[in-house]
Regions:
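Hydrophobic, proline/glycine-rich low-complexity stretches
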Residues: 1-46, 54-58, 63, 172-205
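Short amphipathic alpha-helical surface micro-motifs
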Residues: 14-20, 44-48, 70, 110-114, ...
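Conserved small/polar residues in nucleotide/adenosyl-binding loops
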Residues: 207-213
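Preference for bulky hydrophobic residues occupying beta-strand positions
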Residues: 36, 65, 79, 154-156, ...
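Segments adjacent to and within acyl-thioester-processing domains across lipid
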Residues: 74-176
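HotDog/MaoC-like acyl-thioester-processing domains
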Residues: 8-9, 17, 33, 42-113, ...
Length: 213
């Protein structure tokens, strides 16, 4: 239960588990695109995972993953796999780092809700070191401070190791719902679907920025 929200597995964690199953079943090791549908609640007990290969070519393969519990389909994923070790061509990912990299780290605060209510921080957050911008820390605000943009940005890591593709998938559903920075606590906001696109594996500290239009 280290990767749970209460008694429910975290959405990014489930995506990472399904991606792992897909990558082990396909001829290409890296899941460069995945689309996950969370169809029903997954309980904290045994599951089964079934993988179907839909298409295979020299440079990519496509598969479908079904997560089943109590003979009921709980989550479904389609994914495209390739191999970063053989992907060549134009690279447009070299962009200037955002201004936030130049800000002092004391302008960030640990992602921890326990000062609002003891035990309020989900267990999956405690597996990481995450510091977010203070202006996005909705749990420290009062009603007069609300109304900011629906956004959350910060730095995140799990130990000293560089995250692999599965950790990236876990991170993709990591931050609290950004609408809370605008409207305050809204209770449980479930993830109904999650799309990840991984273009290359990271080589350094990760900065993450989530926003809602």
């Amino acid at each position: 239960k280290d990767y749970f929200v209460g008694n429910t597995p975290h959405g990014g964690y489930l995506t990472a588990v399904m991606q792992k199953a897909l990558s082990l079943s396909m001829p290409h090791p890296h899941v460069i695109n995945s689309n996950t549908l969370y169809l029903d609640r997954t309980e904290p007990k045994e599951i089964s995972i079934h993988v179907d290969k839909i298409r295979e070519s020299r440079g990519s393969s496509v598969g479908r993953v079904s997560l089943i519990q109590d003979e009921k389909l709980r989550c479904m994923m389609t994914g495209i796999c390739s191999d970063f070790n053989y992907m060549n061509g134009v690279n447009d990912l070299e962009t200037l780092p955002p201004k936030i990299f130049n800000e002092k780290r004391d302008s960030f605060i640990s992602l921890n809700f326990d000062n609002k209510q003891e035990g309020f921080t989900p267990s999956f957050i405690k597996q990481t070191k995450c510091d977010i911008a203070k202006q996005h820390a909705w749990w420290l605000k009062n009603e007069n401070d609300l109304g900011d943009e629906a956004r959350c940005a910060g730095f995140i890591s799990m130990g000293e190791e560089i995250p692999d593709q599965f950790v990236l998938s876990f991170y993709s559903d990591f931050f609290p719902p950004v609408v809370m920075n605008k409207y305050g606590p809204l209770g449980w906001v479930p993830t109904l679907s999650l799309t990840t696109n991984i273009r290359q594996v990271p080589t350094c500290l990760l900065y993450t920025s989530d926003a809602a239009d």
